[in-house]
Amino acid sequence: LKPLYGSPSSPRALHKTMDAYFKSEGFDTIGFEESVWVRPAGGKYPEDIYVSAHVDDCLICCKSLDVMSKFKTDLLERFKGTDEKEVEEYLGCELVRDRKARTGHLVQAGYGARVLRAFNMWDSHPVATPMDATTRLSKLDCPTVVDPHVHRKYRSIVGCISYLVNMTRPDLAFSFSQLSKFLQCPGDTHLSAAYRVLA
């Protein structure tokens, strides 16, 4: 796989190679999600195995450590890589487990902290709601000539909020939907509203 690195078509070529391998092992993709595979119990693996891949990082889920170890061994025979053992962070999300309750949930505290630092919001005072109830964002607040600095910063903030909404913060979805209406012509009012969501 080393020759794939650096080529513009590398991710696609790697995905096709991984997909062919997983399908040869009895896996199939889940619906329209082409980077998540599931293998039903049976044969050399007596329980369901789920694999999620992001470029060359794989997250493997199954019930028993024995089955997972066997699958990891088989996978690492085919693809050169390392076994990072228990996952703590994946795609900017930390996995928090309660072994006694047999539960797990995702948080993005680290990602959120990086976003706050990137936009100099680390010392901001928290607010009770992401958007002020009296704020009405409007096209009337759009400038006739967009300041490139405001435009770039606004798009960056809204992009970061989008990732939070999609992963762990659906409570920010309304704010995100309102802010995303003004990606082409944000003004100072829109930028202030975006900063408030980060607070």
Regions found by a protein language model. Name each.
Residues 1-199:
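Long, low-complexity, charge-biased intrinsically disordered regions
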